[in-house]
From Swiss-Prot:
<comment type="function">
    <text>Cell surface proteoglycan that bears heparan sulfate. Functions as a coreceptor for growth factors and morphogens, such as the products of dpp, to regulate signaling and distribution of these ligands. Required for cell division patterning during postembryonic development of the nervous system. Plays a role in dpp/BMP signaling possibly by stabilizing dpp and thereby creating a morphological gradient during wing development. Might have a role in testis development.</text>
</comment>
<dbReference type="GO" id="GO:0016324">
    <property type="term" value="C:apical plasma membrane"/>
</dbReference>
<comment type="similarity">
    <text>Belongs to the glypican family.</text>
</comment>
<dbReference type="GO" id="GO:0008586">
    <property type="term" value="P:imaginal disc-derived wing vein morphogenesis"/>
</dbReference>
<protein>
    <recommendedName>
        <fullName>Division abnormally delayed protein</fullName>
    </recommendedName>
</protein>
<feature type="compositionally biased region" description="Basic residues">
    <location>
        <begin position="41"/>
        <end position="52"/>
    </location>
</feature>
<comment type="subunit">
    <text>Interacts with nord; the interaction promotes dally degradation. Interacts with Magu. As part of the dally/ Magu complex, associates with fwe (isoforms ubi, LoseA and LoseB) and is unable to interact with fwe independently of Magu.</text>
</comment>
<keyword id="KW-1003">Cell membrane</keyword>
<feature type="glycosylation site" description="N-linked (GlcNAc...) asparagine; atypical">
    <location>
        <position position="97"/>
    </location>
</feature>
<dbReference type="Pfam" id="PF01153">
    <property type="entry name" value="Glypican"/>
</dbReference>
<dbReference type="GO" id="GO:0071694">
    <property type="term" value="P:maintenance of protein location in extracellular region"/>
</dbReference>
<dbReference type="GO" id="GO:2001261">
    <property type="term" value="P:negative regulation of semaphorin-plexin signaling pathway"/>
</dbReference>
<dbReference type="GO" id="GO:0007409">
    <property type="term" value="P:axonogenesis"/>
</dbReference>
<feature type="signal peptide">
    <location>
        <begin position="1"/>
        <end position="26"/>
    </location>
</feature>
<dbReference type="GO" id="GO:0045743">
    <property type="term" value="P:positive regulation of fibroblast growth factor receptor signaling pathway"/>
</dbReference>
<keyword id="KW-0472">Membrane</keyword>
<feature type="lipid moiety-binding region" description="GPI-anchor amidated glycine">
    <location>
        <position position="602"/>
    </location>
</feature>
Length: 626
């Protein structure tokens, strides 16, 4: 009985425990349900309140956008862009309510047109400088030649009066020949190899022959009127005697070395003048041909960023009349403009710089030197006078040579009457034209500034516009803020890492390579005409040709990683380097889920203790029962 009573008591205790545990579990489940229901009601209320706030803000934004877009609409109409104000469809590029996709397409074309116009303007200006200087230089040396002829006639009429009737025509013929060789329109060889009446290579030899012919003709006149003087020296020399003197001109050497000096100096200086004018015109042609290619070199990426730079602020409701609202980031502007011009600038920059260096050397060492065309023309009448004086000084020796070779002079009556010993009336002293040195100095200054023309052709735009130099609080392509991308230097190698418009190494550059070859030929023609600098010029040209047409696009070496910081995504957002959000170490989805379930099962420590006590009692009960 005692054992039975014990078992009965144990059974009752077990029943009571089970009931207690059941009640506790039921109570716990009811509390969880209440908490879950209350959480659901709170979430629904919060979601409803947020939706009302969002709808209210959207309503306010629509009203504000409508007002802003109305202001932008008038600006668009002023630049011939049709706009209906606010669009329900936002443009894919700018993302503003004031432009749809069609508007953005129009604005993109207009931005590209503005860029081309900028290039046309600067190219046309430089081309005009080259063409104008070629014409002004030609005009000046022709004027000098005409004045020199007048001064020579005046000299003969004052000093060598008896020679005037016979020498007037030969002097005029010589100067006519000189001026014909200085007219570049007849000597010009364009960059396509098409010749005028003569190529400049024949100018020097033809002119030297004309100078020699002048002195050969002058010899009988100078000998008869200034050397072989006598009372019976009346009349003209017989034609046969004149022919004898002219035929033996080289052996008699009447004027010393002066004819050879004039031949050399005049021939070389006129040749250099033609080379100079020819180079100016060919360089202007290259600029003109490059000007026609600008539009073909604009990539879609370039056009996209030109749109973002010029008009996306307007599409987002910022009126262009307010400079503070549309102020561009200086670094962003430079990167876009340099990236858009990198293809032709990278190819043409070095060859163009070489041409400018050669032109500078040609002007300073040949055109403006003591043996340059200006000084040579100014001293022609002095050369002629010195030649006659040399013949007179060596008169006795010269007469011996003449009598030995041609005999005693044979005379004929004057064909046009006896020459008047009195000097003919002449105009007031002839003055030289304005010295061209100031104009040439200005030209040299201008052409020297154009040495990096293709590198800096677009920088002027960013320098002239209203920009934020420190790249703070400005338009960075997608928003107003700070522009944190690196400003990439000009040059093909650097522009590969342009964060906005990266250099396109696969672009078609066939026509540009043709222009590179033309620039090399211009520099080579200048170098060939200036042999004193031929070694250095040849070395420089060979170096340039290694970078010019036909060359590869180059290899990126181990320093590619060094430029990694500059190699941005190209989105132009100006947000700076992107730091990806990484998950905490050791944190996975599964672990997040297990932690959530742990919160439910172990949120109350008393429940864990009761469960442990219950399991202990049940174990004891089953042990007793067994």
């Amino acid at each position: 009985m005692a054992a039975r009573s014990v078992r009965l008591a144990q059974l009752l205790l077990f029943t009571l425990l089970c009931g207690f545990v059941g009640l506790s579990a039921a109570k716990h489940l009811d509390l969880d349900g209440i908490h879950h229901h209350q959480h659901h009601l709170h979430s629904a209320t919060t979601h409803h309140r947020r939706r009302l706030q969002r709808d209210s803000r959207a309503k306010d934004a629509v009203g504000g956008s409508t007002h802003q877009c109305d202001a932008v609409k008038s600006y668009f109409e002023s630049i011939d862009i049709k706009s209906s104000g606010t669009y329900s469809e936002k443009g894919a590029i700018c993302g503003g309510n004031c432009c749809n996709n069609a508007t953005e397409l129009e604005l993109r074309d207009k931005a590209a047109g503005m860029f081309e116009q900028l290039l046309h303007h600067h190219t046309s200006s430089l081309r005009g400088v080259l063409e104008t200087n070629a014409k002004q230089f030609q005009s000046h040396v022709l004027e000098l030649a005409q004045i020199s002829e007048n001064m020579t006639h005046s000299l003969f009429s004052k000093v060598y009066t008896r020679m005037v009737p016979s020498s007037r025509m030969m002097i005029h013929q010589l100067y006519t020949e000189i001026m014909n060789h200085l007219i570049y329109t007849s000597n010009y060889t364009n960059s396509n190899g098409q010749l005028g009446r003569r190529g400049i290579g024949s100018v020097q030899s033809n002119l030297e022959e004309a100078v020699r012919h002048f002195f050969v003709q002058l010899f009988p006149v100078a000998y008869h009127q200034m050397v072989h003087l006598s009372k019976n020296n009346l009349g003209d020399l017989h034609e046969d005697y004149v022919n004898c003197l002219q035929h033996n001109f080289d052996e008699m050497h009447p004027f010393g070395d002066i004819p050879q000096q004039v031949q050399s100096n005049l021939g070389k200086s006129v040749h250099m003048s033609n080379v100079f004018m020819n180079a100016l015109l060919q360089a202007a042609e290259v600029l003109s041909e490059a000007d026609a290619l600008y539009g073909e070199q604009l990539t879609d990426t370039c056009k996209l960023h030109l749109l973002k730079m010029h008009y996306c602020p307007n599409c987002n409701g910022h009126h262009s009349s307010s400079r503070s609202e549309t102020k561009l980031c200086y670094g962003y502007c430079k990167n876009v403009m340099r990236g858009c011009s990198a293809e032709y600038a990278g190819l043409l920059d070095s060859p163009w710089s070489g041409v400018v260096d050669s032109l500078n050397n040609l002007v300073t060492t040949h055109i403006l030197s003591d043996t340059g065309i200006i000084n040579v023309i100014k001293h022609l009448q002095t050369y002629f006078s010195e030649a006659i004086m040399a013949a007179m000084h060596n008169g006795p020796e010269l007469e011996k040579k003449v009598k030995k070779t041609c005999g005693t002079p044979s005379l004929t009556p004057y064909s046009s009457g006896e020459p008047d010993a009195r000097p003919p009336p002449h105009k007031n002293n002839v003055k030289w034209a304005t010295d061209p040195d100031p104009g040439m100095v200005l030209f040299l200054s201008t052409i020297d500034k154009s040495k990096e023309f293709y590198t800096t052709i677009v920088d002027n735009f960013c320098d002239e516009q209203q920009h934020s130099r420190d790249d703070h609080s400005c338009w960075s392509g997608d928003r107003f803020g700070d522009y944190t991308q690196l400003l990439i230097n000009p040059g093909t190698d650097s522009q590969r890492y342009n964060p906005e418009v990266p250099f396109n190494a696969k672009a078609q550059t066939g026509k540009l390579n043709e222009l590179v070859d033309k620039l090399f030929k211009i520099r080579k023609s200048i170098g060939a005409a200036a042999p004193s600098n031929s070694i250095q010029a040849t070395h420089d040209i060979q170096n340039d040709m290694g970078e010019g047409s036909g060359g590869g696009e180059g290899q990126i070496g181990d320093d590619e990683e060094e430029y990694g910081g500059a190699h941005g995504s190209g989105d132009g957002s100006g947000d700076g380097p992107h730091t990806p959000i990484e998950e905490s170490e050791g944190t996975t989805t599964n672990e997040v889920e297990s932690r959530d379930s742990g919160k439910t099962s172990g949120s109350n420590p008393l429940e864990g203790t009761a469960t442990w006590m219950l399991l202990t009692l049940v174990t004891m009960l089953f042990s007793s029962c067994s």
